[in-house]
Amino acid sequence: MRRLLLLLPLVVVAARMQIEWLWFNQFNLANVLLERWLLQVLLAGVAMLPLLAARAWSRQFRQQRLTSSQGISLRGWPYGIALLICAVVVLISALLTLDLLALAISDPFQLGDWQSNVWPHSRIGSVVKLVQVGGIGLAMTWLRLRPWLGRIVAASWVVVVSRTWGIWSLALWIPNESTKDPLLGADLSFGLGRFAGLHLALDLLLLGATFTLVFELWRVLASSQAISDWASPAFSPRQMRLIRLLSALLLFGAAGLVWLSRHQLLWTQHGLVAGAGWLQAHMTLPLRGFATLLLLLMGLALLLPCQRRLRQFLALALATLVMLETLATPLTRWLVVRPREFALQERYLKNAIEATQWGFQLDQIKSQVDDPSRFSPTDREEGASTLENVRIWDSGPLLEANRQLQQLRVYYRFSNAAVDRYPLNQDSDSSQQVIVSARELDQSALPRRSKTWQNRHFIFTHGYGFTVSPVNERRDDGLPSYFIKGLGTETKIAGNPALGIERSEVEKEIPVGDAALYYGMLPSPYAVAPTDIAEFDYPEGDINVMTHYQGSGGVPIGTWLQRCSAAVYLREPRLLFTNAINADSKLLIRRDVRSRVKAIAPFIDFRGEPYLISIPDAQQGSSNRINQNSNQRQQHQYWVVEGYTHSSTLAYSAAVSPDDSDRYLRNSVKAIVDAYNGSIRFFVSEPEDPIVNAWIRGFPDLFEPMQAMPLLVRDHRRVPEDFFNVQVNQLKRYHVDDPQIFYNGDDVWQVPSEIYGGQKINVEPYHITAQVQGNNNSEFLLLQPLTPLARPNLTAWLVARNDGDHYGELELIDFPKDKIILGPEQVQALIHQDPDVSEQFGLWDQDDLELVQGNLLVLPVGSGLLYVEPVYLRTRKVGLPSLARIVVSDGRLVAMDQDLNLALDQLMKKAPPV
């Protein structure tokens, strides 16, 4: 029986390994999983080496007989203090090891900065923490349990080292950047990849050595005889040599950490300088260099025979250095730096500006000054392509309308609405902007009686279909217009005569097909398909249309061995007793696309909301083939997931915010996930990023160059709004190149505010279709207006290009500083001051009706600026928004109508001749 119990963990591990292997194998990436396993086994073996050394040290220490008359012993209060210190250190080091273990299991890539992720923000609850303290205390006092405490700490140490394979791999694989930091001369790759590995290695070695030394001392001091006598047995000379040996190792490790702390100064904010300033360069760095030398000498003094006075002198010198850094640093800052701060800090401010611009790709911005004229009929004619695609539907109101008009059943959910573009009008040089929203299955919305095990895992397995709406059109009743709506055989595909778009073009460019969505944004439980039980596909009137999964994705569980492994993996014994599973059945797991791609590439940070694309002929020809593993059915729907590499240890780069410590960020990976089969491909969008190049070096079969991305998918690339927002945030202060202007702070920008739905919010970036200087064709752009700090007038805007070879390029349009250009908040005030508009708003916003002013857009049209704001009406009870009016302004006059062109006609009539 005992042997069976010992075999049980092995059975669980074997089952999990089999399911993971089969899951990776469906993508032909089993070699990636095997490499990760081998790395973890190798690291576990490496971690065993210091543990074996610690065990040998402990064995040597215990072999020496302790006496009460020979050697060094402690009595009275010194003994009591030593006993207390040992108890506290053993408790803290054991708790810290368990916290590191918890972090290594939950998110091992956070261990590179474990100090800010473990304490004080421990991931273990207070009750569990109390249980841990009680258990450790019991093991320390109960002689029979004491060896188990050491074994648990040692095993935890091995698991932590093994689980952090990503940190060690990045440190080994990252290539040199060939750019050095301006103060210490280290290659930038040291901070981006190697520092975390070195620091963690020293931390773990120090933690292990500390626990080993103090645990053995505690074993001696806490013996029943010692406590009874309130005196420790005497330590023999050999034991003292062993103690000095391990103490010297601790000093050498501390010297390494102090040396590395010199580099930490380069990515720590010091006043205005995002890194080491004059004070750190001329005082802190030398002091820490001397401290490193003293720690090394102290370690050598413990190993080599020398006089006691020398050791005391070295300890006193180290204490003096610590006092100097603690006390002299603020005095020097006050007496020396503050009186002539800019003169001393100019060089370091320049370093911070250049590093921050490089860290967030602000150095690639192309700047130009534009002096916009007043909007005129000529601008209206020249900017026709921009006006054709003005977004009058915000994502929020359209999503709410979708939920009320197109969810169709209680268990469907539209979780997001993404702006995209499709070439629907062959007579136009620009693509049609649309909002795409996927209809996913939300199992949490199933009625309670329907939440049976069979329903959740065998029948309700997938969502179905999506809606596509033009951003610039509405129905006569004010509700959204649709190119695609409905689902199943009742899916309606329509053109739009007002936009010059025919139904055939919509069918060609946005194919629907059998739009079953087995993978999506919403968290979904595992599904088993196909089985002998038919799956719910979509409703058709009062009838439910059923289907069977025909995709290539999933883990095969047709054999009994596979089914047993799946039951163990999911902790679901019912899989063993159901008669529904057949030889073709597969287990579909990790159906949330973000967790799906994260499981394969945990070293890439997948942020933001994925967005759905639907493209034609995705599998015809090698250049357009997305799902290379499936020949069962033609699939049109795919999810695009944005992946990032980031670092908080780039020298002199400023952190994004107090809550976001990133000092380096790249949108380096784009993952494409088949919404039906679940297949995944990873494309590298930043080939010059040293971090992603490290992972390419380690896993060459995982990544593909952007040139390998099918053209149909490449046409739907977008600069992620998350990444763009970070760039805008850093640009607000770091758009200047002159350290004097930066120091004075007289050219700081901010994101403007607007009133949306009665609340004051920051203006979010929005997509427009417009021409960029030097390109005669209109492009799909992401735009963010900017205003001076504490002033509402417009000062600049940042534009990200999304089309073709210009993808990712940034254009900064500066407006003349001597000219007043109204910002969004000022234009909204102008709108409310217009008597006709104000009167109409007052008539609407009363009783059961609620008026919602949408996002105010500032648009470059021709050589002028045009402000456009949609106005929605909704009842307070039902909340179905309808587009009531469109307000336009040229910055002086305001006009409003039900149609954009009619509103522009009114504006032109009001405007004096130019």
UniProtKB/Swiss-Prot annotation:
Keywords: Cell membrane, Membrane, Transmembrane, Transmembrane helix. InterPro entries: UPF0182. It is found in: Cell membrane. The chain crosses the membrane at residues 4-24, 37-57, 81-101, 123-143, 152-172, 195-215, 240-260, 285-305, 312-332. GO terms for cellular component: extracellular region; plasma membrane. It is a multi-pass membrane protein. Belongs to the UPF0182 family. This is UPF0182 protein Syncc9605_1323. It comes from Synechococcus sp. (strain CC9605).
